[in-house]
Amino acid sequence: GKFREPVIRITNWARAFGATSQSGKYVFVSTASNIDLSQAPLTSPSVFNFWRPGYTPPNSTQLGQHNLVAPEFQIIDEVTAPAYVNLIQETVQNGIGWAAEGFTGHDVRAAYSAEIAIADNASALVDRLNRLLFYGQMSTTLRDRIIAGVNAVPIPAVTGSNQAAIDSAKLTRARTAIFFAMISPEYLVQR
């Protein structure tokens, strides 16, 4: 498979979930730091993109034995791997980018309306993510694990006065499913 570039992952999130800008300006902070994505659009240091074209990851016996290269893996290390998990958690939860003048919080956010609408049905929610993010290629094992994670977030029974708690639980279930999907190895390595 091919390792998805970090900027492509954020772009997938924005497209899949209809992320929009509060200000209309799409105010993004630089994502080039190794505690963000280690990559920023239009800042490639060479015509070969962000990585050396002949790079083979250390200890990758399968690639080495077959004389293959995987330049996109050069961006992964012990700092960037957890940094992506932290960034995607923040992005799914609160959005991404700077607060534009006159606004609070991250500028680019997703409402997750379609996901919230089906959040009471974990299977339907994960099937939707399978279509949006995995192009129908999610394994049964990953699907079952994400469903279990979503079902770990209970939705309160309707009492007539707790709609806010129900809505909050559905939003949490949607965000949980998206987060688990986007940090999974199956999502990170496109097949």
Regions from the language model: what does each represent?
Residues 1-191:
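Flexible, low-complexity segments enriched for small/polar residues
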